[in-house]
């Protein structure tokens, strides 16, 4: 039934800020501002009745107070009144600022000013740092993180330039001005050059050190009194724990000086070809680079750079640095290619339990120094190798080796049981043997004789074993192993005692199953016994099974 006209007149005559009569009617829509309505219903009806929400919540008395904290409804400042501030204090307190922003504003430096500071030139930065003395005081907190990093870089650059300037002054001849170098202190301070990226750096040879080695050779003016100044070398040898460990070790490969001052290194290997290997490593540029950056004057020609020799301590320390990086190759490569599941060692059909290999092994006839081998038929042995157990998970294998001379005498047969390890280039199984009386020099010489590295020089070999990509490509074609004789099963000759002390450096070709190896004997380090094995074709028999 339609309403009467009086109801419409009463609704039109109501105050515009008051609620209309239609919102309080007895229909199914409750009053959203009543106390009987829950908060969820009130919020729901606020969307349904926007006019009722605005008229009920805002009035003429409190409309200005409600909009005070809203930045969008701030009244514009009066141009005639200079005391008015654009930012209302209540509006400023409503913003949520970070602690860094508060510190910058309290110190009078805004974000834009901090950006201008960070975009300064290098000369301005150096001037600011020297004026404020940031080396002794901490960096101000009002700098942004980007500015703090930039300040740190400039500080490091400033220290490097100061060290380089002092080094240049020490290495050059002093001029006619006596106050050019010795104006600050009567005694020249010792300044160390910037350290290398390697964790342990051996001391530099005397020919490569940057220091005042001979003060009498310097030219001074006549008015300069040299007695008041004490000279000190610019680069003094630092204490190296690795070199001290090598000096105190009892290994015959590390020189130890007795009370008379004579080295026992040359007496242990007198006039042997093993000394030629060490001399070849001395002249290797890859090993020489690890001792530190060469001097600019001495590194001008490659001939003078390669003609310098190393002491045994420096050579051992250099090889330790190279093999320390080599041990991290597998870990670095696995982290980079973890999603691809790439491994250096994958199983192959040729190397499994039950595999049999047959070939020849020559006696101690081939020299490490690369001399032509002696091809005497009486010094060849027929070798049969049987693989009993292969465990790729533990990187271990076991087998038996039967060696028989070419003569018809059956008493010349030797049988040994051996255990081996498969190299996966982790921190434990890599090219560094570190056991069985095998130093790093022997590892370099014997691994280089195998087929993957046969055409490489020492420089290329050391670069390859520390490069994960190159080493991974080689492992796709070869498997590297070490075999160690553990037990003599049948001994009827006198040569078995010498063979049990050594071990084999082996590599297996994945394409055809060919095994190439070299036997190393610590008692006869100047000779290596090559081993060549070929897989026997197994006889395959048909098998049946029911489905």
Swiss-Prot record:
Q: Where in the cell is it found?
A: Nucleus
> Which organism does this sequence originate in?
Schizosaccharomyces pombe (strain 972 / ATCC 24843) (Fission yeast)
Encoding gene, per UniProt annotation: gid10
The entry's keywords? Nucleus
> GO annotations under biological process?
negative regulation of gluconeogenesis; proteasome-mediated ubiquitin-dependent protein catabolic process; protein catabolic process in the vacuole; protein targeting to vacuole
Q: Does the keyword Nucleus apply?
A: yes
Q: Spans of biased composition, class Basic residues?
A: 99-108
Under InterPro entries, the record lists: Vacuolar_import/degrad_Vid24 (IPR018618)
Subunit annotation = Substrate-recognition component of the GID/CTLH complex. In the absence of stress, the complex exists as an inactive anticipatory complex (GID(Ant)), composed of Gid1, the E3 ubiquitin-ligase Gid2, Gid5, Gid8, and the RING-like subunit Gid9, awaiting a substrate receptor to form the active E3 ligase complex. When cells are shifted to glucose-containing medium, the substrate receptor Gid4 is induced and becomes part of the complex, named GID(SR4). Additionally, Gid7 transforms the GID(SR4) E3 ligase core into a higher-order supramolecular assembly (Chelator-GID(SR4)).
Give an example GO cellular component term for this record.
GID complex
Q: Where is the composition biased (Low complexity)?
A: 186-199, 207-217, 298-307
Q: Which domain of life is it from?
A: Eukaryota
**Which positions, given as ranges, span the membrane?**
none
Q: Where is this region: Disordered?
A: 1-42, 60-115, 169-217, 285-313
| Protein's UniProt keywords contain Metal-binding | no
Q: According to the UniProt entry, which residue ranges have a biased composition of type Polar residues?
A: 1-11, 28-41, 169-185
Per the annotation, which location comes first and is thus the protein's main one? nucleus
Q: What name does the UniProt record give this protein?
A: GID complex substrate-recognition subunit 10
Known function: Substrate-recognition component of the GID E3 ligase complex recruiting N termini and catalyzing ubiquitination of proteins targeted for degradation. GID E3 is regulated through assembly with interchangeable N-degron-binding substrate receptors induced by distinct environmental perturbations. Required for the adaptation to osmotic or heat stress. Specific for substrates with an N-terminal Pro (Pro/N-degron).
**One Pfam family from the UniProt entry?**
Vac_ImportDeg
Family label: Belongs to the GID4/VID24 family.
